[in-house]
């Protein structure tokens, strides 16, 4: 089970985002919802796809990737692009293990996404969409000053905006 492609496209339409833009995705691990099916369909509809490459200092950047390309494996055992064309996505799909109605997320604690979103928002406006299962909702996520609020949370049942 995954999020609705129809609902994701509603979000894109709301911001008048058409194909030929970069969508930043992720390779799902553990309990993260799988976004690869959505990304594959988007790529077939002429959206450009990118995936993160993480570094040992808890930083990451996004790199152009296509389903025709191979993937390497990083120091944590997570598949990553072999390509080295760094880009800044226009829309960033964010993984999570928990979320609340205020659109804050709980990750694995490394701060990769919070740091990346904070850095990129200084350079350009991006749309952030957390992908989640509805059962991952928590009444209130404990937040600190580094936590980044998402624009949307898209679950298998609804859009939270």
Locations of the language-model features?
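Conserved residues at the C-terminal ends of beta-strands
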Residues: 26, 95, 156
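N-terminal active-site beta-alpha-beta segment that forms phosphate/nucleotide-binding
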Residues: 1-87
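Short, basic/glycine-rich phosphate-binding loops at helix/coil junctions
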Residues: 62, 95-97
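Surface-exposed, charge/polar-rich loops and edge strands
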Residues: 87-92, 101-104, 115-161
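Charged helix-capping and loop-helix junction motifs
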Residues: 40, 108-114
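Residue-level signal for inorganic ion chemistry
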Residues: 49, 109, 153
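Short glycine-rich anion-binding loops that position phosphate/pyrophosphate groups of nucleotides
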Residues: 29-31, 97-101
């Amino acid at each position: 089970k995954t999020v609705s492609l129809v609902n994701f496209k509603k979000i894109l339409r709301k911001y008048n985002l058409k194909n030929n833009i970069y969508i930043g995705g992720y390779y799902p691990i553990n309990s993260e919802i799988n976004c690869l099916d959505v990304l594959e369909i988007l790529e077939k509809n002429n959206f450009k796809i990118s995936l993160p490459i993480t570094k040992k200092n808890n930083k990451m950047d996004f790199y152009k990737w296509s389903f025709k390309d191979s993937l390497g494996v990083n120091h944590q055992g997570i598949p990553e692009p072999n390509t080295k064309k760094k880009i800044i996505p226009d829309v960033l799909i964010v993984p999570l293990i928990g979320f609340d109605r205020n659109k804050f997320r709980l990750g694995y604690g490394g701060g990769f996404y919070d740091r990346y979103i904070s850095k990129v928002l200084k350079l350009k406006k991006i749309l952030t969409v957390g992908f989640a299962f509805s059962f991952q909702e928590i009444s209130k996520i404990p937040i600190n000053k580094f936590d980044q609020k998402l624009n949307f949370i898209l679950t298998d049942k609804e859009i939270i905006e």
